[in-house]
UniProtKB/Swiss-Prot annotation:
A single cellular component GO annotation: cytoplasm
UniProt KW Isomerase keyword: yes
Protein name per Swiss-Prot or TrEMBL: 1-(5-phosphoribosyl)-5-[(5-phosphoribosylamino)methylideneamino] imidazole-4-carboxamide isomerase
Cytoplasm is among the record's keywords: yes
Taxonomic source organism: Methanococcus maripaludis (strain C7 / ATCC BAA-1331)
Length: 238
């Protein structure tokens, strides 16, 4: 199982938000490319980049840093945040991203995944599903749909999604541990790999995810606040 450090960018800084709220930050650091290199030097085999300006405002202001990290990190990079069109996705893959992460637009219009898979291949497409109280939420967690993650996951798998990034919003950024069940339901019901995110605070949390068969886990606040040592975490889940 992969342990995948998050490098979330806002206003050209590396940040970690509490519950996705741009006004509440655990962490704010300069020079995201240097942070990315630090995680790779500690053993990260993949990086998870999020352009929060893109996600929140639909404006891409961190492209320079994103391209820098793709070029210099030496590991595959998955990127999300503000990818709202096929053109955005193709642009990032051409720049060298390993995977693009598509969120709201895929839930609202799953057909876009079919079109995109024809252009870049399923293996390059990760769809981000975020759930709150058992239902998928979209638009930066502001709007709740009537669908469960498994219902939407099956549709997206059929359309050509290569993997799912699943965030349990109830746990995200609070540093109070995980609820494994919603992720397990996805792993049990879909064939494509599931990457989990949200609420990991201990190596024990990571081992719980490993036990249910996830492909990887994105870690954010816990490594920035030194609750988890990345090197130890990677070693523990090998």
């Amino acid at each position: 199982m992969l342990v995948i450090p998050a490098v979330d960018m806002k206003n050209k800084k590396c940040v970690q938000l509490i519950q996705g709220n741009p006004d509440k930050k655990h962490v704010e650091l300069d020079n995201p490319p240097e942070i990315a290199k630090k995680w790779v030097s500690e053993g990260a085999e993949m990086l998870h980049l999020v352009d929060l300006d893109g996600a929140l405002d639909g404006k891409r202001v961190n492209d320079e840093f994103i391209e820098d990290i793709i070029k210099t990190s030496g590991v595959p990079v998955q990127i999300g945040g503000g990818i709202r069109s096929i053109e955005d996705a193709v642009y990032l893959i051409e720049k060298g991203a390993e995977k693009v992460i598509i969120g709201t637009v895929a839930v609202e219009n799953p057909e876009i995944i079919r079109e995109l898979s024809k252009k870049i291949g399923s293996e390059k497409i990760m769809v981000s599903l975020d759930a709150k109280d058992g239902k998928v939420v979209i638009k930066g967690w502001k709007e709740k749909t009537k669908y469960t993650p498994v219902e939407i996951g099956k549709i997206l798998e059929e359309m050509g999604a290569g993997s799912i990034l699943f965030t349990n919003v109830d746990s995200e950024g609070l540093l109070n541990g995980i609820n494994i069940e919603p992720t397990k339901e996805l792993v049990d019901n879909l064939k494509i790999p599931i990457v989990a995110s949200g609420g990991v605070t201990t190596i024990d949390d990571l081992l719980k995810f490993k036990k249910i068969g996830v492909y990887g886990v994105v870690v954010g606040s816990a490594i920035y606040k030194n609750l988890i040592n990345l090197k130890d975490a990677i070693e523990a889940v090998k």
